Each structure stands twice: as structure tokens, then as C-alpha cells.
Amino acid sequence: MTMRALTAITIAVLACAGCTTSTKAPATDSSAPPAPLTVSVTIKNGVVTPTNATLQTRVAEPIVIRVDSDTADELHVHSTPDHSFEIEPKSGQTFQFSVSVPGKVDVELHKLKKTIATISVQP
């Protein structure tokens, strides 16, 4: 192969390489905290929504319960550790907790004797 042919091939290869573009996928931040499991609860005229919901989350991930209520009650989370929150007759109440032991966790209203949800907490 002559020097002229070798030079032509090299130029052609470099020209083709310059025509391509590389698009990288945006980096994901694996250290970002997980989105919390959020449950919106309404208590109105003795009716609770939702009831007996089945949900899932993982150990130590945040769980948020948002409550709009027209009556006072106690929200009790049967978990390790246990959590209790006083519900007032008002809108926009937010309660946050996490669970440190895997298993089934019941979230209940004590005065109305209703189970809002059972949360399956995975390791």
C-alpha cells in the first residue's frame, strides 16, 4: 500500500469518526432518598377513606399519612417501633414515620375502630 493510499484511508476514518455523536443518559443519583409512601385519609361524618388498604414499602423508608378530619381521634401504627398521632378536627394534618422491622403493619383509628391500611414492610 502506498503512502498516499494509507493517508487517504486515515483521513476517511477520522472524518467518519468525527461525524458520530455520543449522547450519554443523564446520571441518576442513587443516593437520593426514596420517595415516601403517602396515604391520604379523609374522616367525615364517621366515614373513613380509605379502609383496609393493602400497601407496600421497605424498612426505614418514610411513610407519610395526610389527614383531613372533622373529628378528633388517635392514629396508631402497630409497628416496631410503635407510633401514635393525635388527630384534630381540621384539614391538612401530616404525620411521618418509618418502620425498622419487616412485617405487616396495621394503621388504625382507635376511636372509630377502623383499619386504614395494612402495610407490608419488606427488608
Language-model segments: which ranges?
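Positively charged n-region of N-terminal signal peptides that target proteins for export
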Residues: 1-7
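N-terminal edge beta-strand
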Residues: 32-60
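Beta-strand cores of secreted/periplasmic/IMS beta-sandwich domains, seen most often
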Residues: 53-71, 93-101, 105-108
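A structural detector for beta-sheet-dominated domains
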Residues: 42-44, 58, 68, 78, ...
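Extracellular/periplasmic metallocenter environments
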Residues: 21-26, 35-37, 89-123
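Short, low-complexity, disordered segments immediately C-terminal to signal peptides
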Residues: 7-36
